[in-house]
C-alpha cells in the first residue's frame, strides 16, 4: 500500500454526508494530510447556508494536525467527495485553503495535492500559487532564522 492509498482510506472512512440541522450540512467532502513527520490527520467539511460558516475538509484536517501535534508543514493532501480525485481538478483546494497552507508555513509550497488518484498525478502548491503575495515576507523570516 502506497502513501496515497493510505491517505485515501483514512479520509474515506469519514465520508458520510449528513444534514446537521436545517442550515448546516457536513461530511460531503473529506481530506487527509500527511504531516512532515509522516503522521496522517483527517477532516471533513461543514457548510452553513448563511455563507459565513464554511470549513473545508482540508482546513479541518490542518486544524486537527496543528491541535494534535503542533506541526505546520505538510507533505501531501488528498481531498474528495464520493470517489478519489480524478481528471484535472476534482481534488483541487479552494483559494482559502491554498492561502491558509502558505500562511501556516511557506515551506508548504512544496506539498503535493493528488490530482488523479488512478494515475497518481500530483501538483505542488507552488505550481498552483506561483506568485504568492507573502513570499517576500516569508523569505525574510527564513533568512533571519538562518543568521
Whereabouts are the PLM-identified features?
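Histidine- and/or cysteine-centered catalytic micro-motif in compact active-site loops
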Residues: 34-36, 45-48, 82
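Active-site cofactor/substrate anionic-group-binding motifs, chiefly glycine-
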Residues: 56, 60, 65-68
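Short beta-strand scaffold segments in enzyme catalytic cores
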Residues: 25-36
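Hydrophobic "anchor" residues
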Residues: 39-40
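Compact, glycine-rich, soluble single-domain proteins
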Residues: 45-59
Amino acid at each position: 500500500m502506497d502513501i496515497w492509498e493510505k491517505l485515501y482510506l483514512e479520509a474515506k472512512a469519514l465520508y458520510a454526508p449528513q444534514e446537521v440541522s436545517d442550515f448546516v450540512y457536513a461530511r460531503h467532502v473529506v481530506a487527509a494530510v500527511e504531516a512532515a513527520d509522516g503522521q496522517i490527520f483527517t477532516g471533513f467539511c461543514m457548510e452553513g447556508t448563511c455563507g459565513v460558516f464554511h470549513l473545508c475538509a482540508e482546513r479541518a484536517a490542518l486544524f486537527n494536525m496543528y491541535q494534535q501535534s503542533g506541526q505546520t508543514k505538510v507533505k501531501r493532501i488528498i481531498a474528495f467527495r464520493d470517489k478519489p480525485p480524478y481528471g484535472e481538478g476534482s481534488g483541487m483546494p479552494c483559494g482559502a485553503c491554498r492561502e491558509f497552507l502558505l500562511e501556516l508555513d511557506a515551506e508548504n509550497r512544496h506539498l503535493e495535492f493528488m490530482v488523479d488518484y488512478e494515475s497518481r498525478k500530483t501538483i505542488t502548491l507552488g505550481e498552483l500559487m506561483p506568485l504568492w503575495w507573502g513570499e517576500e515576507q516569508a523569505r525574510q523570516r527564513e533568512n533571519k532564522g538562518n543568521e
